[in-house]
Regions:
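Flexible, glycine-/basic-rich loop-and-beta segments that form/coincide
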Residues: 76-173
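Flexible loop residues that form catalytic
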Residues: 1, 71, 92
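Conserved Class I SAM-dependent methyltransferase catalytic core
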Residues: 14-75, 82-89
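Short glycine-rich anion-binding loops that position phosphate/pyrophosphate groups of nucleotides
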Residues: 1-4, 43
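Conserved ATPase-coupling elements of RecA-like P-loop NTPase cores
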Residues: 3-10, 49-50
Length: 176
């Protein structure tokens, strides 16, 4: 869900999240400690000026890795040209007062972007450039055509760190 509107939910109203940020926060809060969540989102989550949703997520989860997709990644099946990110988060066992580098923005080659992608260019599947968008000039990840996107994605995903922890579940009685 995307849009410039908010969801009314007493538990989250104080955060003033837009709808997509609200769903990220609520989803993460529903995951068990140690659970892993993968979000596909626009670059706005990682690159927008307001860091509040990134702070919220960082206090509750470790960023295992993030991949910036080129703006053509969804063109064939969805008809859109939008720079997107895949975020991999592992829920912490408690909320921590922490603000890692990926909460912040930096400028690289004249383009404002998330510190994580500046520090990890191997996770950017293309080249960040300023392009003319619907609301003026904006940053976009233009595709690297030297390799198929699938090969680039496979390589980037090999850099995502973390481990899967076995969860204990209560067995369901077959006689229900």
């Amino acid at each position: 869900p995307f849009g410039q509107y908010k969801v009314s939910d007493r538990q989250y109203d104080k955060h003033n999240f837009l709808i997509h940020d609200y769903f990220f926060a609520k989803t993460l809060d529903k995951v068990r400690p140690g659970g892993i969540v993968a979000f596909v989102t626009s670059k706005g989550t990682m690159d927008k000026k307001n860091p509040e949703v990134r702070k919220y997520l960082a206090q509750r989860a470790e960023l295992l890795g993030a991949v910036r997709l080129p703006n053509t990644a969804f063109k064939e099946n969805a008809g859109t040209e939008v720079t997107s990110d895949i975020l991999f988060l592992k829920k912490r066992d408690r909320v921590m007062d922490i603000e890692p580098d990926w909460v912040h923005l930096t400028e690289k080659d004249g383009i404002v972007m998330n510190q994580y992608f500046a520090d990890h260019p191997e996770m950017v599947l293309g080249k960040m450039e300023m392009v003319s968008g619907a609301h003026g000039m904006e940053s976009a990840c233009l595709p690297d055509t030297s390799l198929p996107l699938s090969a680039q994605l496979k390589n980037a995903l090999s850099h995502v760190e973390g481990s899967i922890e076995q969860a204990d579940f209560n067995e369901i009685d077959d006689e229900l």
